[in-house]
Regions:
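Short, flexible active-site loops
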Residues: 135-137, 156-167
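Catalytic cysteine-centered active-site loop
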Residues: 163-177, 181-219
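Aromatic- and glycine-rich peptidoglycan recognition patches
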Residues: 41, 64, 71-77, 204-212, ...
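Loop/turn positions that initiate beta-strands
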Residues: 9-10, 80-86, 221-222
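Catalytic nucleophile-His microenvironment captured as a short glycine-rich beta-strand/loop
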Residues: 224, 229-239
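Boundary regions of SH3-family modules and the immediately adjacent low-complexity/disordered segments
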Residues: 1-2, 11-13, 18, 25-60, ...
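Active-site loop architecture of trypsin-fold serine endopeptidases
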Residues: 162, 167-168, 228-230, 243-250
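Residue-level "contact hotspot" at macromolecular interaction interfaces
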Residues: 5-6, 79, 215-218
Length: 280
């Protein structure tokens, strides 16, 4: 999405044709503009059937090649990044599974690079779209503890990635892109930008003006820390993971809120605005 966001292969959008550029509305409620030639037109019925079938999988590795055959020597047809959606077919061989892409291409991907998709496109056709995001729950059968553990594990997979404004991919990602992708990969759609937005599940559990010592009392692994124009994920023991465009870092790393820790960032510790949680 021009200058603001990144939409991946296999993701659904609603769109309105405005010529060379089209206005799109994503399945997570974000609006923007895309070039017309980047869209593969599908019907609403196609989207609903895909959701109902339940065989959409998401790429979990930084990158995964789609191969003509089920072997490493086969010809590469496409390279997909973390977050791309594919339709998983029944055919498996040598640790590979056959997948079908939204553009009709079919090939093989290592099964280890995929996981069942947990989020939903229902916002795009639901009757109560204004309530859709706040009424989401964590994946069925998951405990709060499991969800928190999974989002932290997923977030750590972005450590070392370079910073890219508006990015959400393993080859370049911004601060809100990291936390958005981590929650999406674990079945919960949050607001894409670095703030808490009404109508989404993230709610404030601490605000600027309260005692700083309460941050560590209230925040748990997987909760989010918000600054003005910046966001990170709380881990434990005062540490947080974030992707920063700071000239000395320019990427995804871990820092601390605790003065005296080697990775303490005084500027961020003193400027914290809000702590948010989907379990508030």
């Amino acid at each position: 999405i021009r200058d603001r966001d990144e939409v991946f292969f296999g993701w659904s959008v609603m769109w309105e044709d405005k010529g060379e550029w089209i206005e799109v509305w994503t399945h997570y409620g974000y609006r923007g503009w895309m070039e017309r030639n980047l869209i593969e037109e599908k019907s609403r019925e196609w989207m609903e059937e895909r959701e109902k079938a339940g065989n959409t999988y998401v790429v979990t590795r930084g990158f995964a090649d789609v191969m003509r055959g089920a072997r490493v020597q086969a010809r590469m047809l496409e390279t997909l990044g973390r977050g791309c959606f594919v339709e998983k077919m029944e055919e498996t061989e040598n640790g590979y599974c056959r997948v079908k892409l939204a553009n009709g291409i079919s090939g093989f991907v290592p099964e280890a690079a995929l996981r069942k998709r947990l989020d939903s496109d229902r916002f795009l056709w639901g009757k109560s779209e204004e309530r859709f995001f706040v009424e989401q729950g964590i994946p069925e059968g998951w405990s709060e503890e499991k969800f928190r553990r999974k989002v932290v594990e997923c977030a750590k997979g972005y450590l070392g990635c370079q910073y890219r404004w508006g990015g959400k991919a393993a080859d370049g990602i911004d601060c809100s892109g990291v936390v958005f992708m981590v929650y999406l990969m674990n079945g919960v759609l949050i607001w894409r930008d670095a703030d808490i937005r009404e109508g989404y599940p993230m709610k404030a559990i601490w605000r600027e003006g309260e005692e700083m010592c309460l941050v560590e009392e209230r925040a748990k692994a997987g909760d989010l820390l918000f600054w003005r124009g910046h966001v990170g994920m709380y881990l434990e023991d005062g540490r947080y993971l974030h992707c920063t465009g700071h000239e000395k870092v320019f990427g995804c790393r871990v820092n601390s809120l605790r003065r005296g820790d080697e990775d303490f960032r005084e500027d961020l510790a003193e400027a914290l605005k809000v702590v948010g949680s989907v379990f508030s």
